[in-house]
Curated annotation (Swiss-Prot):
It comes from Escherichia coli (strain K12). This is Inner membrane protein YcdZ. It is a multi-pass membrane protein. GO terms for cellular component: plasma membrane. To E.coli YahC. It is found in: Cell inner membrane. The keyword Cell membrane applies. Residues 1-2, 46-48, 93-98, 144-163 are cytoplasmic. Pfam families: DUF1097 (PF06496).
Length: 163
């Protein structure tokens, strides 16, 4: 079984489970899928990728709240919101000089989820975090399944060759 098929199988199964978990816990299922997406899209895999994805998602949530609260300081002055957004977007990118914050799309995913969740970071954050863990489980269980399948196929071939 190839890697893509293995990951597709585990992602399909765990996506269904995530949908149930999200509803059961009162979380945002769509935000959880954004957490999954962050892990899959991160160029680093394994625990390092999980840590980088978590740090960038969290930073995105924080940056979104800076924009939301900063813009609310002077709601009658619309230009302030635009200036704050521009400055924060710059900072969201430049922070990537730090290893744990090096996945810029993760930062923007966290911010966008917070905006879509209308600034309810207390709901967005656990939804993203649990979704991120599901993404880690989806990909790594798929890689495990592919490796196990390859090992089994190799053993079967050795048995055929000996016969």
């Amino acid at each position: 079984m190839n890697i893509l098929l293995s990951i597709a199988i585990t992602t399909g199964i765990l996506s269904g489970i995530w949908g149930w978990v999200a509803v059961s816990l009162g979380l945002l299922s769509w935000a959880g899928f954004l957490g999954c997406t962050a892990y899959f899209a991160c160029p680093q895999g394994g625990l390092k990728g999980l840590a980088i994805s978590a740090a960038t998602l969290l930073s995105g949530v924080v940056w979104a709240m800076v924009i939301i609260y900063g813009s609310a300081l002077a709601p009658h002055l619309e230009i302030l919101g635009y200036v704050i957004t521009g400055i924060v977007a710059f900072l969201m990118c430049i922070q990537a000089k730090q290893l744990l914050l090096s996945f810029v799309p993760g930062t923007f995913i966290g911010a966008c989820a917070t905006f879509a969740g209308q600034g309810d970071w207390k709901l967005v954050l656990p939804s993203l975090a649990l979704g991120l863990i599901f993404g880690y489980a989806m990909k790594n269980s798929g890689l495990w399944l592919a490796a196990r399948s390859a090992k089994t196929a190799h053993r079967e071939q050795e048995i055929k060759n000996k016969a």
